[in-house]
Amino acid sequence: MDTAPPRPQGNPVVRLPVARRPIVQRITLPSLAAVGGADSLALGALTLFLTGFGLVMVLSASSVESGVAGDPFSSFATQGVAALVGAGGMLAIATRLRTAWLPRLAPIVFFSAVAVQLLTALTPLGTSIGGNQNWIRLGALSVQPSEFVKLGLVLVLAAFFSRRPGELLGVRGMLPPVAFTATAIGAVYLGHDLGTCLILALIGFGGFLMSNVRLPVLVLLGGSATVVLLLFSQGNGSRTSRLAAWSNGCTDLLGTCWQTTQAQWALANGGLTGVGIGNSVSKWFWLPEADNDFIGAIIGEETGLLGLAVLLGCFVAMAVVLLRISTRTQDRFTRAAAGMALAWLVGQAFANIAVVVGVAPVFGVPLPFVSAGGSSLLANLAVVGCMMALADRPVTVATTTSIVDPDHPAARGRAVGIR
């Protein structure tokens, strides 16, 4: 007698094994041409132009100081390596990164960067340059972890804003993103870098703004951040003296205002069309930080007002592209991340130029993509790569609140990438 169990009726269910998809797909030559959106292409082109222009200006601005040290191409070579590595990484992120992983990677990137920054600021591993203990020496290279704290803050705030939009309607819901921002600012402030603290506050403000936080809350957050940063500026003698000199009209031309004065003289010497690339006078030890925070003055001197206008025009165009990416998407992660990238890159660029022309006190922030500094360039290119990827392949994140956004893809029955 056959005792086998009866076979079920209907079509049998076949379960196929599901392979885990890697974070980054294999890079091939066709994949490098996969960036097809107009916004991502425009953003990549602007970034590569600014990076290439920055290499030329770093070579010019650093040639005198590097030449006295024995190698006129040393700063240029270091910047060139960072540019090649960073541009390759940017293209890899833009074309092959699975953006669904970005919210998952965000806490890892953020807390790792903050941890390394704390080690830099509080232990002998850190190296002090110009009064800021913000660098770790790795052989012949110096790494600035605070630049990667900016990248981590962009990602972790975007992840929070995308998952819990409804919670931002209450005061308790504001505490986590404020805590993330305060943690980043506090870790960097321990290294005495007020300029980076200002940019981190700007990034946080950009995230709240693009996440539709109410205007009174934005005003409260902005006012609180301003008060805190002013208090921070009083904790260092040189910062206090620079702020006081600027607020009093900067009359100490040979002392506290020397750097600002030399920058303005460089711009005046450049006039409308400049003295020609390589022909700057100010870089001959008149202007401190000529290849870094004050490279804008060398650009104005060598390429004139027209060259500086083209540079600022590129950043305005970048702002337009990032704003398009942020406002044309229904994905909350992309919206918040693009808004914070705009606040970081474009806001920092105009803050740098404001210092150069004397309308803001000297607080030390580099010109994105242009100033010498490998860590800054790598972080800038990494965030642009993320924005290019998100412009083409937005992340869709399910919210955990009871508030349903009818414009959200999940509300219309679309697939949700992360649950």
Predicted regions, residues:
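A juxtamembrane structural motif centered on a specific transmembrane helix
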Residues: 1-25, 29-30, 350-419
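N-terminal membrane topogenic signal
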Residues: 31-47
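Helix-boundary and loop/linker segments of multi-pass membrane transporters
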Residues: 33-37, 169-174, 284-287, 329-330
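Hydrophobic alpha-helical transmembrane segments of multi-pass inner membrane proteins, especially
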Residues: 44-60, 65-259, 297-358, 382-386, ...
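Glycine/serine-rich anion-binding loops at beta->alpha junctions
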Residues: 139-149, 190-192, 271-276, 365-377
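Extracytosolic (periplasmic/ER-lumenal) interhelical loops and adjacent juxtamembrane/interface segments
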Residues: 257-278
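Long extracytoplasmic/lumenal interhelical loops at the membrane interface
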Residues: 271-306, 329
